[in-house]
A protein has these predicted regions:
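RNA-binding accessory domains that recognize and position tRNA/RNA substrates
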Residues: 1-179
Length: 179
């Protein structure tokens, strides 16, 4: 597993240092939140309700069953702005997995940091609520340091995840419309 120094910087001042399995070349902005599920990271990351959020998973190891095809996803891509895990398995052991969590994030241009104390991060979020955050390479501290955190509440997230045209999911005897 490759180790590129990376960090999560919270608007409240805390900095959590870890590593990325791939090079992070820019700053990624989002709202730091946590998820306590033991399984279902593909469903969580593709869930449109996580759009613009940097998701910290509290379960100790993530990625152990890899990523399956899109049929099990909540949408057609990763919606989260970033992924934070304590320990990352890069060699998934599941018959139906098509790739690792790390390769999926890299292909999707979504930053992934491992080696962070997600319990400590969860306590900060629990005590202060969801907080604006930046993911960046640790060696990029002196360059391009943007102190302008993004307020996710000022973005029209619903418009970004909604379909703009009707979508036919399946044909059949009855016509069902979802609005």
């Amino acid at each position: 597993l490759l180790k590129y120094p990376a960090q999560l910087r919270l608007q409240s001042g805390e900095v959590f240092s870890g590593f990325s399995p791939f090079k992070i070349n820019k700053q990624y902005f989002g709202e730091a939140v946590f998820n306590t599920g033991m399984v279902g990271y593909t469903e969580t990351l593709t869930d449109p309700s996580y759009l613009g959020q940097i998701v910290s998973f509290t379960y100790p190891i993530m990625g152990n069953y890899g990523v399956t095809d899109k049929s099990t996803w909540e949408s057609d891509k990763i919606q989260a702005a970033g992924v934070i895990v304590s320990s990352l398995c890069n060699d998934p052991k599941r018959e139906f997995s098509s790739k690792s969590l790390a390769s999926w994030c890299e292909e999707s241009n979504v930053p992934l940091i491992y080696g962070i104390d997600t319990r400590a991060l969860t306590k900060v979020i629990r005590d202060n609520g969801a907080v604006s955050a930046i993911i960046e390479a640790s060696d990029n501290l002196g360059n391009n340091k943007n102190k302008n955190f993004i307020d996710i509440n000022q973005q029209d997230l619903v418009k970004q995840v909604c379909v703009s045209e009707p979508k036919i999911v399946k044909t059949g005897k009855y016509k069902i419309i979802v609005v």
